[in-house]
Amino acid sequence: MEECEEPEEPISLGRQEYRRRRRPSQPMVDKSQQTEITEKRKAMASVQPPAPKATHSIGNIPGSKDNYSRKEYESLRLSSQLQKTLMKRKHVQDMTDKSLQTEPIVEEKVEVIFIDKTLKLEENTAGVGEIAPELPQSIPEVEIPTSRPTSHLIDRSQQTSCTGDWSLIYICPKEKVDKEQQTYFSELEIIIRSIPGSSMTKSKEETIPIAQEDPLVEINGSLEIEVLSPEELPDVMMSFTEGEISGELQALSNGEATVKGELFLTEEIPIQAPSPAEETSAAETATTTAKDVVDIQAPPADKLSSVEAPADISPTLVQGALSDKPSDQQYPQGTEMAPSELPVEDLDPFSEEVLEKVQALTTDSMLEDLGIAESTIAEETSGKVQHPLSEETSKEVPAEVHFPIAADFEESAILINEKFATDEVFEEYKPPIIEEVSADKATAEVQPPSAEDASEEVASSEVLPPSTEQGTVEDLTAEVLSTPTEEGPTEVPPQPTEEGPAEVPPPLSEEGPAEVPPAPAEEAPAEVLPPPAEEAPAEVPPPLTEEGPAEVPPPLTEEGPAEVPLAPAEEVPAEFLPPPAEEVPAEVPPPLTEEGPAEVPPPLTEEGPEEVPPLPAEEAPTKVPPSPAEKGSAEVSPPQTEEGPAEVPPPPAEEFPTEVPSSSAEEGSSEVPLPPTAERPEEAPPPATEEAPVEVLPPATEEAPVEVLPPATEEAPVEVQSPAAEEGLAEVPPPPTEESPTHDVPTEVQVPQAKESPGQVLPLSGESTAEEASAQVQPPSFEKAPLESLPLEEVEKIHLDNLPFEVQPLPTEDIAIGVPAESQALPADENPAREDTVETQPSSFEGAPIAENPIEAPLPASEADTGREDSAVHPSSLGPTDEAPAEIQILQTDDIPTEMSPVENQPLPAEEGFPEVVSEEEATAAEVRFPLSEGAPAQEATVEAQLTSVEESPKRASVDVQPLSPETPVEESPGVDLPLKTNEVTMQEFRVEKMPAEDSLPPSEQTPADQVLLKEHRLSQVADISEKELESTTLTSDKMSEGIDSVPEDVSGTKDDQISTFKIEGTIKIELKN
């Protein structure tokens, strides 16, 4: 056989192998039966016999690609039958052998192939020779195979199937192996092959390079993104920006477009679409656009300028506030290097800012279009509102950037328009101040209605600016970006869009038309506010949205307003807040609108008008107090009186009715639309909370008051306050009014939570008849909210958890802002509890401190930090709220725990931790406890938010938390008493908290994002707490990356960083930061 083999490998070998294989073929038949065994035998035998003879065979197999090829060619020379038979069986056996010998052969082949290829590359026959003696033959053939393989490869690629049978079997197996290995090694082989430049290699190489290049290019984009991502922000930007912005922008598009107007959508989406892909481009574009928008807006000057400057500035402002220069730089850079620079330069700040900015810019671009379009739309939407709307929208554009700012813009736009130079300065970053000042002034002047909205918004915006930044950034980053910033609605809409968008748009539409300014304002405010104030709420709404995206938008919108007030309240807002609070009412109407679009208008109209008047009454917020007042009429009354509740009551009554109707109706409607409520939970919780929820809750809870509460809720604070009002409602209301909005949202959120435990809430309510009423109502609300809220809230929670960071960031923001609402918003998920808590806390936090002056004193920091009259006001509310919040919180805790089992669990931790935390609280515990307390109730997010909330809460929540222990009972039983206890405890706790108060503040701000940001931003202050909290928050933060977004205005800048982080990076970023 060997002779035959030697004489003619092809013929002899063919025959002999044929024979041999025939022999094995019988075993092969058997083999088919005895597959393994026979194969092995055959393989062994075949391999072995072929080893000598098959050396050629094997040689053929490994190196014999050549030999075999030649052989086959020669075989081809042989009779076709022999060849066929041979090939068939040979292939079979070879395949079998190969399969058996695959590894060795493959290895050999691989070696050969690699070497072959290498040889091919190098053309080293020696290498081949080294591979096998056979290869010497194959050596020439190696070269030949080089050609043939090339041909074969080519053929193979072409003839994969046909020729591939044997050619492939050998070649393929070899080459396939090679290829696979090359495929795996494709890099090496590609490289190697690239070296050889074989057609295959080239093709492959080219193909791969092309593919890779594209991917690489894409990847480069991605990589850049990723690379940027290494920068965190870039990644976040890219991911966030791309996904987020895309999502957000798109979300914005959906939500915003929906909300803002298809213009927005169209404009925005384009940008959006670009933004994701282009995010950088979009960022640039957005940035450029933003700049252009600035320019363009500048042309709109009034709006765009105002807006844009604000937008730009807002971002700048916000960012400027946070990262003034970075904003600017980022802005420019954003323009140029949006992706890289954005991420790179400030990456975090920048990125976020940029993101925010980009989004802002993008938003601006969109807004630009939107602003124009929206202005148009806004204008169209509401002729009169339109301007504000437009401005607002324009602002909203900025608002989108920082809708909060948008709010400012609305106001600022107006103000800015008034103070356009300032606006320009705004651009300079003074704008922030100016904006704020303007916001303040504007708030004062705008405050009337616009002022109210604007103020609120401005305040919000203003607050938001930071908030926005946070909100925006947060929004941007968080989604809030989209949601809050983009428009809490828009984004939220996106999320809300999911629900919100429609709703948001409704708010927008409803609001837009009626409230359009509010809508925009609200949107901007809401959105803006939401972003900031609501941001947590709104954001929360987003979380809520998550929970009830749609809701979120409403929340944003609604809450935004309310929340915005919160935010504003929170920020400058405190002062503005009152207007905002009131405004929130007005704005709330939007929320109402949101909640009850139709209603909203009424509410808006009534409320808005009324509210606006209330605005003056501003503390029409009192109105909220009214709610509280209503809620806790007598009780609240004092607060109302404080707030002007009397007035408010009427307005509340009216508003209440109106608002309540609106809110209530809205809430009832919308709320009733628990679906909306569901949304509402979000919305309600946020908006509702802010308004409906709270309102509902408060109203419902309080009085059915639901309606009234709505107003109250509107001043959910009231509601929350309700409890507080109930407890110290009167007191709370005023603060509530101011804080109310803030609280409001929280309350609302709370509502959800309360909602969660209507009973509990009731117990809370029980605690105070009013409260009980509230609770009652709340239960309705809660029920409503609970139903939805619970689900939503839960969803929210989930979403929050998912979005948590966003939400949380909001909270942070808010919290930071002092709008615990935000935290609440964040909590929103937990929000309800948190919100309530937070808000209440904010109230508590602010108010509580005030309420519990001791804490307030500490809180003052928070409060100061929060910079909330709210604090002051809230303190009253807070005091009550504190108590109520405690209740609520407890409720929340209960509810939240219920709603958020996590929270619940957490609450326990909070409770447990709470004391524990309390120790820390002394150190940082307030915060920690805060988180724990509230967090426990709320959730981790809550924790985080709670950190914030709790922080605030600690003031009241702390007490609450302490009640937490009671809270556990509370949890067990709403423990109406507990709330009371809490109240009492609150005093105590507050004292303890008091120390934390400061921490609190940071914690509030510190809210996850805040923490991080705070950490950075306030790091000094918060450093310890931030750190601690951050850690705890980090989880929460990560969970609630939103928290990052939430980063208070202060934190804003940082938050921006966080923001980028916040969403995706939020966690990552946080991690990174952490």
Curated annotation (Swiss-Prot):
Which cellular compartments is it found in?
Cell projection, Cilium, Flagellum
Bias kind Pro residues: ranges: 528-544, 576-592, 673-688
One GO biological process this protein is involved in is: negative regulation of protein sumoylation
Q: In which tissues is it expressed?
A: Expression is restricted to testis and epididymis, expressed by spermatozoa.
Assembly and oligomerization: Interacts with CABYR. Interacts with ROPN1 and ROPN1L; the interaction increases upon spermatozoa capacitation conditions.
According to the record, the residues making up region (Disordered) are 1-73, 272-294, 317-343, 437-789, 818-982, 1026-1054
Q: What keywords would UniProt list here? A: Calcium, Cell projection, Cilium, Flagellum, Phosphoprotein
KW GTP-binding (keyword) present:
no
| Chief site of localization | other
Name the species this protein comes from. Answer: Mus musculus
Name of the protein this chain belongs to: Fibrous sheath CABYR-binding protein
Q: Which residues carry this modification: Phosphoserine?
A: S25, S57, S186, S275, S365, S1020
Named from the GO MF annotations, one term is: calcium ion binding
> In what way is this protein post-translationally modified?
Phosphorylated by PKA upon spermatozoa capacitation conditions.
